[in-house]
């Protein structure tokens, strides 16, 4: 998993509430177990019309937001079914950070396991960042995980909270497999001890 330390990039404003995982990546695209290739179908039903043409009014289709790495959105983001394809699609598109007033719990935890930083902020601070994001490519936002700060184009800084263990995992690029590999020596020692104590098992 790619480390997340400091990210400076374009923030895309999506002022919608209750964006569920089916809106993030519709069910017809869940047939794969690969993490790559899902970005093209991110927000599929909002990005494209029935003929498959891009909707020019959708934020991520606008030229100034096509390379967005940060998404600023409304409360309860990621609600609905617990599909891990949702963070996979965001990451494959290029989104490394999602900022919202609140998140669905399972989606929130899945983000950390896939290299995405979800940040929950008070509504007024999200509104400020939404206004900043409306400036498009002329306004970059910096998210500093180590110092737990967000810096806007006007130089203002917002602090955010994050669980210490989840922060450690993102800073070091550790997913569940990476965490297990860190403990290989301890696991081997335990298995050897258990085998010696109970050779009949």
Swiss-Prot record:
One of the GO BP terms on file: L-leucine biosynthetic process
GO function term, MF aspect, one: 3-isopropylmalate dehydratase activity
EC number: 4.2.1.33
Annotated CDD domains: IPMI_Swivel (cd01577)
Transmembrane segments: none
Primary enzyme class: lyase
Keywords of the record: Amino-acid biosynthesis, Branched-chain amino acid biosynthesis, Leucine biosynthesis, Lyase
UniProt KW Amino-acid biosynthesis keyword: yes
Catalytic activity annotation: (2R,3S)-3-isopropylmalate = (2S)-2-isopropylmalate
Quaternary structure and partners: Heterodimer of LeuC and LeuD.
Similarity comment: Belongs to the LeuD family. LeuD type 1 subfamily.
Official protein name in the record: 3-isopropylmalate dehydratase small subunit
Organism: Dinoroseobacter shibae (strain DSM 16493 / NCIMB 14021 / DFL 12)
């Amino acid at each position: 998993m790619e480390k997340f330390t400091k990210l400076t990039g374009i923030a895309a404003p999506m002022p919608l509430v209750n964006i569920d995982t089916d809106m993030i990546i519709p069910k017809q695209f869940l047939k794969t177990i690969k993490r790559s290739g899902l970005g093209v179908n991110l927000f599929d039903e909002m990005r494209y019309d029935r003929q498959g043409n891009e909707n020019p009014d959708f934020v991520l289709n606008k030229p100034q937001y096509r390379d967005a790495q940060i998404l600023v959105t409304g409360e309860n983001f990621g609600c609905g079914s617990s599909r891990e394809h949702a963070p996979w699609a965001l990451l494959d598109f290029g989104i490394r950070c999602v900022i919202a007033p609140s998140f669905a719990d399972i989606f929130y935890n899945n983000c950390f396991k896939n290299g995405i930083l979800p940040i929950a902020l008070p509504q007024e601070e999200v509104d400020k960042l939404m206004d900043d994001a409306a400036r498009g490519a002329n306004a970059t936002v910096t998210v500093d995980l180590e110092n737990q700060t967000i810096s806007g184009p006007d130089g203002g800084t917002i602090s955010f909270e994050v669980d210490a263990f989840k922060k450690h995992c993102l800073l070091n690029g550790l997913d569940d497999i990476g965490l297990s590999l860190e403990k290989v020596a301890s696991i081997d020692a335990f298995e050897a001890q258990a085998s010696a104590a109970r050779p009949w098992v």
